[in-house]
Curated annotation (Swiss-Prot):
InterPro entries: Bombinin. This is Maximins y/Hv type 1. Expressed by the skin glands. One of its GO terms (cellular component) is extracellular region. Disulfide bonds: none annotated. It is found in: Secreted. The modification Phenylalanine amide is found at residue 68. Residues 1-18 form the signal peptide. It comes from Bombina maxima (Giant fire-bellied toad). Maximin-y shows antimicrobial activity against bacteria and against the fungus C.albicans. It has little hemolytic activity. Maximin-Hv shows antimicrobial activity against bacteria and against the fungus C.albicans. Shows strong hemolytic activity. The modification Isoleucine amide is found at residue 141.
Amino acid sequence: MNFKYIVAVSFLIASGYARSEENDVQSLSQREVLEEESLREIRGIGGALLSAGKSALKGLAKGFAEHFGKRTAEDHEVMKRLEAVMRDLDSLDHPEEASERETRGFNQEEIANLFTKKEKRILGPVLSLVGSALGGLIKKIG
């Protein structure tokens, strides 16, 4: 009789362990799906910010070109820098497959840090160029 109880309890423990393993596997796959969705959201937000920045810079560049007509050497250099920044922004619109494979293993915080570093690397020069261009424009108007 004791043997039957031992077998029954062992069976219950084994089935409970199997269920917990199954639940762990399911929760792990759910976490992977959520991480993948978060990556897509982050990329979507980054793409939207980059496209908004690009359109603003294009409008600014067109405005400068229309307003000044002929450019001085300094204006020409500023426009060259803006065009280089625009090319950099265009290259960020289409991330390569390799970078996507690299980011799959990162957690959300690491991914957010990567995007922040890229934004700082791009937005710093862009803001300084826009600031200097606007400063030159204000000097010419004033």
